[in-house]
Amino acid sequence: MHQRNHHSILLTLLLYLQSIVALARIIDPEFGTYSNPNPRKYPQCQANDLVKLSSCCNELLHKLDQCKSDDLACECCALQSIDRDCYHLCPGNPSTNFLTVLLQDCAQLSEINACALPFKKTDDLLVDKKKGTPNSKSAVQALEADEKYDASLKSKVHNKVDEIKSHVKQDQFLKKKIKLLIDKDETFAIQNHSNNSNNTISAKSESGSVCLTSSYLNSPIIILCAILTGTLFAMY
């Protein structure tokens, strides 16, 4: 009996827990589970506030661009103005974090209004450039010297070529006899060809008749001509 009572108590507890979970799901809306567990400590900026903040920062950053080089007072004046005049439009905005990094350079002027300090009227970089004009001229002179050096090199090479041409004259090649070396078999073939051509030409010149040429004896027409001429001489 005691065990049965124990089991019944456990079942009732389980049913009770399930009913509590079901009621919690019905009462609590679903989007409640997506709420931010760590809400922001600063008020949310509206869209108009962000537009004002952006225009204010752009205006002061433009003044920062007009500062002379190494003018700490001018630069810190612009940064302090952004921190003082712009970020009150949207307090606690996370974008102020980058400004804290920039203001580290102005730490020595943190208790002073940098805008009340005198700004530089001349730019040190421009002065350095003006002082550096002789150096620029010397650089130009160095370039001109390099060009002259290159030209002298070209003239030297040209002179060397002229000297070589003066030593080598074309008359040496014109007066020099050139010997052609021909193989013995080729010379024998050339001589036979020249002898055959000479025999043919001499035979043509000795006899006005084509029938008496030795090179034409193999032709049957010429043989018939010779027979006819022989019979004609025999008849007379």
UniProtKB/Swiss-Prot annotation:
Signal peptide (residue range): 1-24
Membrane-related topology note: Lipid-anchor; GPI-anchor
Glycosylation, residue list: N192, N195, N198
GO cellular component: plasma membrane; side of membrane
Keyword terms: Cell membrane, Glycoprotein, GPI-anchor, Lipoprotein, Membrane, Signal
The keyword DNA-binding appears for this protein: no
Predominant subcellular localization, coarse grouping: membrane
Subcellular location: Cell membrane
Cleaved propeptide residues: 209-236
Lipid sites, type GPI-anchor amidated glycine: G208
Record's protein name: Predicted GPI-anchored protein 43
Organism: Candida albicans (strain SC5314 / ATCC MYA-2876) (Yeast)
Gene name in the database record: PGA43
